[in-house]
Amino acid sequence: MKKKSVLLALGVLVLGLGGGALAALPSLPTPSILDVASPNAREISKLFWLVMGFSIFVLAVVVAFMTAGIIGGLRDRNHDEEPPQTHGNLKLEIAWTIIPLIILAILLVPTLSAIYRLEGYAAPEDALEVNVVGRQFWWEMVYPELGIVTANELVAPVGQPVRLNLASGDTMHSFWIPQVAGKTDLIPGNQRAMWFTPEREGVFYGQCAEICGDSHANMRLRLVVLSPQDYEAWVAAAQRPAAPPEDALAQEGAQLFVQKGCINCHAVQGVNAYNRAGPDLSHIGSRTSIAAGMLPNTRENMIRWLRFTDTVKPGVAMPNLGLSQEEAERIAAYLETLTLPEFDLRAAIRGEGPQNHVNASGYPVDEAGSLSETEIASMEGDR
């Protein structure tokens, strides 16, 4: 009796600690396959509920038989005779082999039907075409028919089919935005494609779903779905370069951008920066996030990203340039000026606000998206 009490107390303690840990976690944007935003996701959700229903039914039957056996055993626990044995019972063995096969066959039909509906049709001719390349640890987005190049944020109009031509630039990745489509693996040397039609406006969060290195968990992306009018305005703005910086601090940052070698890896539309080893920064000032969806796009976060790149995102190809606080402030001020001309993307997004995040390095981000001063000191110590 004493042993049972100890085990019960330990169980309560574990549950309490687990609940406390969950309560202490910040509110993360958690995409769900059940909160569908496209016909493709609806097919997957319907199949999920069908399989879940069968699973619950099977579980209920198994638990019912187990309960009956336990109750029967308790009633007969004072009897010495051996209970009936089923070993070698051919009828029972055939039954518990055939019944699961029947259940699997029943589930196979809607599964194959859903796969055919999702992958058996070509994208409509009016589909928006975007080339997506997964790289450690970010996403390159190219609109070939529009001449637009961006990174980590896929912008599309509501109600229009979107065809994604998927490829990997280094190792295996998997493209996944749960609310609009299933996973598609990206294998080096292979071209893949998928398409979907977003049904509502908003921001939908995605993630690389294939372990691809140290910062796999930090390889995020966002699908920004706009109204047709806002999308047309975004296209017109994205096809134009950002205005030259007028502020003295930003102008100094533009010079440092060249002097520190940033120009060797990053393209900026309208200036002599065409290399695309890293993300295109032409309109980074208008994006909702930086570091592939890890941090909200604020000047404070940009400064910390520039100074502590390899600490915020371990394994990233971007080198730590050893920038001083003043140098990082100037470059961040310059990057902040690289905005979409005459278009405010954040204002066009419905219901988008500051999110709480914890990056995979373990450094928490507060409500404004800025790392705490304690964590900054920790990062400086790591260097």
What are these regions (language model features)?
Residues 58-62:
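Seven-transmembrane alpha-helical bundle of G-protein-coupled receptors
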Residues 286-290:
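A short, flexible beta-alpha/helix-coil linker loop
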Residues 55:
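Globin-like tetrapyrrole-binding proteins
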Residues 2-3, 20-50, 63, 70-276, ...:
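Non-transmembrane, membrane-proximal soluble domains of secreted or membrane proteins
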Residues 1-12:
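N-terminal membrane topogenic signal
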